[in-house]
């Protein structure tokens, strides 16, 4: 039984909770407005998703359209002090709101139970800092989702995504003896890069998360054509990031793991 998957490391928003990853995107828009009266769109707020939140704000400031707006208002580009100010506005807003987005995505609870029945451990990590995770984790547990371990983006001196460190910290905490027997699951490109950099199998989620960018209710009423277009857009970004597999949501993960286990049993290696 050595040649099989022993652990999955799951992202949070858009992967296990918060269908469409709306908690952080809305708060970025509000933080820019509150700190500097600068408008950004939800679509712009989604572009760097998966990074740590300070790095996310930094990346937003470098988007050509956002930089142009900033230059028009302040006659200069965004500085580190500006990023600090937006982050300072972001944090209390996110801490206050994250519990409203803590319900598990459809299929998550059953999938976790199925994985655990196979002896697979459940790790997790997030682009959220610890202060946010300390609110989100117990709220999600109240809804029935409780991974075996979690790591926040500001926990490790080495940093967060797209580096491998949060994923590897899960490997250490869970006592997994081979990174190639782990699967990193994420709905955004930096999380796929994280898994690849850690030497893991990677699975992208094309519908439940940031790249698809729809609420659960909107998804339920969406035409098949619209779903197909959005799915293809999201899948192409995740495959471009290097994902080994792309599926709709975490509910599809057990089938993927069965496929990976078959490949491992035949001697295939990453």
Curated annotation (Swiss-Prot):
Its Enzyme Commission number(s) read 3.11.1.1
Q: Look up the record and give one Gene Ontology term from the biological process aspect.
A: DNA repair
Q: Which UniProt keywords apply?
A: Hydrolase, Magnesium, Metal-binding, Schiff base
GO cellular component annotations of the record: cytosol
Provide the cofactor note recorded for this chain's UniProt entry.
Answer: Binds 1 Mg(2+) ion per subunit.
Would you identify the family this protein belongs to, as annotated?
A: Belongs to the HAD-like hydrolase superfamily. PhnX family.
How would you summarize the oligomeric state and partners of this protein? Homodimer.
What is the protein name for this chain? Phosphonoacetaldehyde hydrolase
Q: What is the lineage of its organism?
A: Bacteria, Pseudomonadati, Pseudomonadota, Gammaproteobacteria, Enterobacterales
Gene name linked to the record: phnX
């Amino acid at each position: 039984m050595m040649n099989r998957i022993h652990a999955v490391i799951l992202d949070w928003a858009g992967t296990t909770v918060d269908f469409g990853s709306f908690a952080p995107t809305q708060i970025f828009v509000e933080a820019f407005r509150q700190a500097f009266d600068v408008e950004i769109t939800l679509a712009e707020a989604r572009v760097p998703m998966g990074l740590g939140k300070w790095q996310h704000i930094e990346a937003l400031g470098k988007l050509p359209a956002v930089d142009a707006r900033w230059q028009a208002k302040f006659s200069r580009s965004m500085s580190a002090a500006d990023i600090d100010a937006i982050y300072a506005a972001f944090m209390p807003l996110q801490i206050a709101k994250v519990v409203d987005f803590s319900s598990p995505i459809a299929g998550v609870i059953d999938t976790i139970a199925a994985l655990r029945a196979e002896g697979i451990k459940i790790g997790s990590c997030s682009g959220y800092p610890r202060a946010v995770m300390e609110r989100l984790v117990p709220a999600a547990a109240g809804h029935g989702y409780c991974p075996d371990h979690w790591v926040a983006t500001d926990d490790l001196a080495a940093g967060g995504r797209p580096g491998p460190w949060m994923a590897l910290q899960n490997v250490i905490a869970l006592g997994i003896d081979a990174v190639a027997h782990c699967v990193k699951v994420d709905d955004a490109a930096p999380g796929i890069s994280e898994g690849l950099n850690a030497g893991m199998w990677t699975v992208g989620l094309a519908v439940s998360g940031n790249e698809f960018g729809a609420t659960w209710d909107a998804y339920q009423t969406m035409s098949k054509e619209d779903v197909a277009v959005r799915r293809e857009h999201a899948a192409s970004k995740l495959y471009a990031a290097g994902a080994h597999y792309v599926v709709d949501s975490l509910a599809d993960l057990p089938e993927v793991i069965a496929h990976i286990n078959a490949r491992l049993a035949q001697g295939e290696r990453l």
